[in-house]
Curated annotation (Swiss-Prot):
Protein name: Thiazole synthase
Purpose of the protein: Catalyzes the rearrangement of 1-deoxy-D-xylulose 5-phosphate (DXP) to produce the thiazole phosphate moiety of thiamine. Sulfur is provided by the thiocarboxylate moiety of the carrier protein ThiS. In vitro, sulfur can be provided by H(2)S.
Keywords assigned by UniProt, alphabetized: Cytoplasm, Schiff base, Thiamine biosynthesis, Transferase
Gene: thiG
Keyword match Transferase: yes
Location of this chain's protein in the cell: Cytoplasm
Origin: domain of life: Bacteria
Length: 259
Protein backbone atom coordinates (compact mmCIF):
# COMPACT_ATOMS: atom_id res chain seq x y z
CA UNK A 1 0.00 0.00 0.00
CA UNK A 2 1.30 3.47 -0.90
CA UNK A 3 1.21 5.63 2.23
CA UNK A 4 2.31 9.10 3.26
CA UNK A 5 5.03 8.77 5.90
CA UNK A 6 5.66 11.71 8.23
CA UNK A 7 8.30 10.68 10.76
CA UNK A 8 6.77 7.68 12.56
CA UNK A 9 3.22 8.52 11.45
CA UNK A 10 1.59 6.84 8.47
CA UNK A 11 -1.41 8.13 6.51
CA UNK A 12 -3.25 6.46 3.65
CA UNK A 13 -4.60 9.81 2.41
CA UNK A 14 -2.29 12.31 0.72
CA UNK A 15 -4.83 15.12 0.91
CA UNK A 16 -4.48 17.41 3.94
CA UNK A 17 -7.32 19.80 4.74
CA UNK A 18 -7.33 23.29 6.15
CA UNK A 19 -10.34 24.28 8.22
CA UNK A 20 -10.65 28.05 7.72
CA UNK A 21 -13.18 30.03 5.67
CA UNK A 22 -16.01 27.49 5.88
CA UNK A 23 -19.49 28.94 6.37
CA UNK A 24 -20.03 26.80 9.46
CA UNK A 25 -18.42 24.04 11.49
CA UNK A 26 -21.02 21.60 10.16
CA UNK A 27 -20.10 22.37 6.54
CA UNK A 28 -16.42 21.98 7.40
CA UNK A 29 -16.98 18.61 9.05
CA UNK A 30 -18.90 17.30 6.05
CA UNK A 31 -16.04 18.38 3.78
CA UNK A 32 -13.48 16.65 6.00
CA UNK A 33 -15.50 13.44 5.87
CA UNK A 34 -15.93 13.62 2.09
CA UNK A 35 -12.24 14.34 1.54
CA UNK A 36 -10.99 11.19 3.20
CA UNK A 37 -8.28 13.34 4.80
CA UNK A 38 -6.64 11.99 7.94
CA UNK A 39 -4.47 15.02 8.72
CA UNK A 40 -6.28 18.31 9.32
CA UNK A 41 -4.78 21.66 10.24
CA UNK A 42 -6.40 24.04 12.73
CA UNK A 43 -5.36 27.51 13.88
CA UNK A 44 -4.71 27.97 17.59
CA UNK A 45 -7.52 30.52 17.84
CA UNK A 46 -10.00 27.77 16.85
CA UNK A 47 -9.19 25.83 20.05
CA UNK A 48 -11.87 27.52 22.11
CA UNK A 49 -13.88 25.44 24.56
CA UNK A 50 -15.29 28.61 26.15
CA UNK A 51 -17.07 29.72 22.95
CA UNK A 52 -18.27 26.58 21.24
CA UNK A 53 -19.27 28.40 18.05
CA UNK A 54 -15.58 29.23 17.52
CA UNK A 55 -14.22 25.85 18.60
CA UNK A 56 -13.15 23.42 15.89
CA UNK A 57 -10.96 21.22 18.06
CA UNK A 58 -13.86 19.58 19.83
CA UNK A 59 -15.84 18.58 16.72
CA UNK A 60 -12.74 17.47 14.81
CA UNK A 61 -11.38 15.40 17.68
CA UNK A 62 -14.61 13.40 17.64
CA UNK A 63 -14.10 12.29 14.03
CA UNK A 64 -12.51 8.83 13.82
CA UNK A 65 -9.12 8.57 12.14
CA UNK A 66 -8.34 12.30 12.24
CA UNK A 67 -4.95 13.63 13.37
CA UNK A 68 -4.80 17.33 14.14
CA UNK A 69 -1.97 19.52 12.92
CA UNK A 70 -2.21 22.84 14.78
CA UNK A 71 -0.80 25.84 12.90
CA UNK A 72 0.70 29.13 14.01
CA UNK A 73 -1.28 31.33 11.62
CA UNK A 74 -1.35 34.86 12.99
CA UNK A 75 2.22 34.72 14.28
CA UNK A 76 4.53 37.38 12.86
CA UNK A 77 7.74 36.33 14.63
CA UNK A 78 9.52 33.12 15.58
CA UNK A 79 8.88 33.83 19.26
CA UNK A 80 5.13 34.10 18.67
CA UNK A 81 5.11 30.90 16.62
CA UNK A 82 7.05 28.99 19.27
CA UNK A 83 4.65 30.15 21.98
CA UNK A 84 1.62 29.21 19.86
CA UNK A 85 3.11 25.79 19.11
CA UNK A 86 3.60 24.96 22.78
CA UNK A 87 0.08 26.08 23.69
CA UNK A 88 -1.31 24.04 20.80
CA UNK A 89 0.54 20.91 21.89
CA UNK A 90 -0.83 21.27 25.41
CA UNK A 91 -4.38 21.67 24.12
CA UNK A 92 -4.37 19.04 21.38
CA UNK A 93 -1.73 16.53 22.40
CA UNK A 94 -0.57 16.48 18.78
CA UNK A 95 3.16 16.37 17.99
CA UNK A 96 2.54 18.07 14.63
CA UNK A 97 2.92 21.80 14.14
CA UNK A 98 2.56 23.73 10.93
CA UNK A 99 4.86 26.72 11.27
CA UNK A 100 3.19 29.61 9.51
CA UNK A 101 4.74 33.07 9.95
CA UNK A 102 3.56 35.81 7.61
CA UNK A 103 4.03 39.31 9.05
CA UNK A 104 2.55 41.22 6.09
CA UNK A 105 -1.25 40.81 5.87
CA UNK A 106 -1.32 42.20 2.34
CA UNK A 107 0.53 39.38 0.58
CA UNK A 108 0.82 36.78 3.39
CA UNK A 109 4.23 35.62 2.18
CA UNK A 110 6.06 33.50 4.78
CA UNK A 111 9.05 35.08 6.53
CA UNK A 112 12.02 32.79 5.79
CA UNK A 113 14.27 34.05 8.60
CA UNK A 114 11.66 33.78 11.34
CA UNK A 115 10.41 30.45 9.96
CA UNK A 116 13.93 29.01 10.04
CA UNK A 117 14.44 30.08 13.65
CA UNK A 118 11.08 28.75 14.81
CA UNK A 119 11.61 25.45 12.98
CA UNK A 120 15.05 24.98 14.52
CA UNK A 121 13.78 25.52 18.06
CA UNK A 122 10.60 23.48 17.69
CA UNK A 123 12.36 20.53 16.06
CA UNK A 124 14.81 20.48 18.98
CA UNK A 125 11.82 20.38 21.35
CA UNK A 126 10.41 17.25 19.73
CA UNK A 127 7.74 18.74 17.49
CA UNK A 128 7.09 17.30 14.05
CA UNK A 129 7.64 20.57 12.23
CA UNK A 130 5.85 21.26 8.95
CA UNK A 131 6.98 24.72 7.79
CA UNK A 132 5.02 26.76 5.26
CA UNK A 133 7.58 28.43 2.99
CA UNK A 134 8.09 30.24 -0.27
CA UNK A 135 9.29 27.91 -3.06
CA UNK A 136 12.97 28.37 -2.19
CA UNK A 137 15.10 25.23 -2.74
CA UNK A 138 17.94 26.49 -0.52
CA UNK A 139 15.61 27.26 2.39
CA UNK A 140 13.84 23.92 1.95
CA UNK A 141 17.15 22.07 2.27
CA UNK A 142 18.18 24.07 5.33
CA UNK A 143 14.87 23.26 7.01
CA UNK A 144 15.40 19.59 6.26
CA UNK A 145 18.84 19.81 7.87
CA UNK A 146 17.47 21.21 11.15
CA UNK A 147 15.05 18.29 11.45
CA UNK A 148 11.73 19.27 9.89
CA UNK A 149 9.35 16.40 9.15
CA UNK A 150 8.40 17.93 5.80
CA UNK A 151 8.50 21.19 3.89
CA UNK A 152 5.37 22.93 2.63
CA UNK A 153 6.19 25.29 -0.25
CA UNK A 154 3.39 27.42 -1.63
CA UNK A 155 1.95 26.80 -5.07
CA UNK A 156 0.97 30.47 -5.19
CA UNK A 157 -0.18 33.08 -2.68
CA UNK A 158 -2.63 32.01 0.04
CA UNK A 159 -6.21 32.18 -1.18
CA UNK A 160 -5.21 33.49 -4.62
CA UNK A 161 -6.34 30.47 -6.62
CA UNK A 162 -3.42 30.99 -9.00
CA UNK A 163 -2.48 27.32 -8.91
CA UNK A 164 1.06 26.06 -9.39
CA UNK A 165 2.65 29.37 -10.35
CA UNK A 166 5.84 28.16 -8.65
CA UNK A 167 6.07 24.86 -10.54
CA UNK A 168 9.67 25.35 -11.72
CA UNK A 169 10.98 25.91 -8.19
CA UNK A 170 8.77 23.18 -6.78
CA UNK A 171 10.38 20.71 -9.17
CA UNK A 172 13.82 21.57 -7.80
CA UNK A 173 12.65 21.23 -4.20
CA UNK A 174 11.10 17.84 -4.94
CA UNK A 175 14.24 16.63 -6.67
CA UNK A 176 16.58 17.71 -3.87
CA UNK A 177 14.50 16.87 -0.78
CA UNK A 178 14.85 13.75 1.31
CA UNK A 179 11.72 14.58 3.31
CA UNK A 180 8.13 14.87 2.06
CA UNK A 181 7.28 17.93 -0.01
CA UNK A 182 3.69 19.09 0.47
CA UNK A 183 2.28 21.85 -1.72
CA UNK A 184 0.37 24.30 0.42
CA UNK A 185 -1.64 27.34 -0.74
CA UNK A 186 -2.94 28.67 -4.03
CA UNK A 187 -4.56 25.55 -5.47
CA UNK A 188 -7.92 26.29 -7.07
CA UNK A 189 -8.93 23.20 -9.04
CA UNK A 190 -8.63 19.46 -8.43
CA UNK A 191 -6.62 19.21 -11.65
CA UNK A 192 -3.91 21.32 -9.99
CA UNK A 193 -3.71 18.87 -7.09
CA UNK A 194 -3.32 16.06 -9.62
CA UNK A 195 -0.55 17.97 -11.37
CA UNK A 196 1.29 18.57 -8.09
CA UNK A 197 1.15 14.87 -7.32
CA UNK A 198 2.26 13.98 -10.85
CA UNK A 199 5.32 16.18 -10.29
CA UNK A 200 6.26 14.05 -7.30
CA UNK A 201 4.83 15.95 -4.34
CA UNK A 202 4.13 13.73 -1.37
CA UNK A 203 0.82 15.42 -0.55
CA UNK A 204 -1.21 18.59 -1.03
CA UNK A 205 -2.90 20.85 1.51
CA UNK A 206 -6.13 22.45 0.36
CA UNK A 207 -8.44 24.89 2.13
CA UNK A 208 -9.83 27.87 0.19
CA UNK A 209 -10.62 25.91 -2.98
CA UNK A 210 -12.92 23.65 -0.98
CA UNK A 211 -14.32 26.14 1.54
CA UNK A 212 -15.15 28.76 -1.11
CA UNK A 213 -16.88 26.38 -3.51
CA UNK A 214 -20.66 26.19 -3.85
CA UNK A 215 -20.61 22.61 -2.57
CA UNK A 216 -17.62 22.08 -0.25
CA UNK A 217 -18.26 18.39 0.39
CA UNK A 218 -18.46 17.62 -3.32
CA UNK A 219 -15.34 19.67 -4.02
CA UNK A 220 -13.53 17.86 -1.21
CA UNK A 221 -14.41 14.54 -2.83
CA UNK A 222 -13.12 15.85 -6.17
CA UNK A 223 -9.80 16.82 -4.58
CA UNK A 224 -9.64 13.41 -2.91
CA UNK A 225 -9.99 11.65 -6.25
CA UNK A 226 -7.63 13.95 -8.15
CA UNK A 227 -4.93 13.66 -5.49
CA UNK A 228 -5.15 9.88 -5.66
CA UNK A 229 -5.10 9.94 -9.48
CA UNK A 230 -2.05 12.19 -9.57
CA UNK A 231 -0.16 9.95 -7.17
CA UNK A 232 -1.03 6.84 -9.17
CA UNK A 233 0.12 8.53 -12.36
CA UNK A 234 3.42 9.51 -10.74
CA UNK A 235 4.00 5.97 -9.51
CA UNK A 236 3.11 4.53 -12.91
CA UNK A 237 5.51 6.90 -14.67
CA UNK A 238 4.46 9.62 -17.11
CA UNK A 239 5.54 9.28 -20.72
CA UNK A 240 8.38 11.52 -21.81
CA UNK A 241 7.60 14.72 -23.68
CA UNK A 242 8.80 15.07 -27.26
CA UNK A 243 9.22 18.16 -29.41
CA UNK A 244 8.06 16.17 -32.41
CA UNK A 245 5.13 13.91 -33.18
CA UNK A 246 5.74 10.23 -32.48
CA UNK A 247 3.51 7.82 -34.41
CA UNK A 248 1.51 5.33 -32.39
CA UNK A 249 0.87 3.07 -35.41
CA UNK A 250 3.22 1.84 -38.18
CA UNK A 251 3.48 4.18 -41.16
CA UNK A 252 4.40 1.39 -43.59
CA UNK A 253 2.54 -1.49 -45.24
CA UNK A 254 -0.79 0.34 -45.30
CA UNK A 255 -3.28 -2.06 -46.96
CA UNK A 256 -0.43 -4.05 -48.41
CA UNK A 257 1.35 -1.06 -49.99
CA UNK A 258 5.02 -0.40 -49.41
CA UNK A 259 6.11 3.17 -48.75
Amino acid sequence: MDHLQLAAHTFSSRLILGTGKFSSAAVMLEAVKASGAQLVTVALRRFNREQLEDDLFGPLSELPGITLMPNTSGASTAAEAIKAANISRELSGSPFIKVEIHPNPQHLMPDPIETMEAARVLASEGFLVMPYISPDPVLAKRLEEVGCASVMPLGSAIGSGQGLASAAMLSIIIRESSIPVIVDAGLRAPSEAARAMEMGCSAVLVNSAIAASDNPAEMAAAFRDSTDAGRRAFKAGLMRESREAVATSPLTSFLGEQS
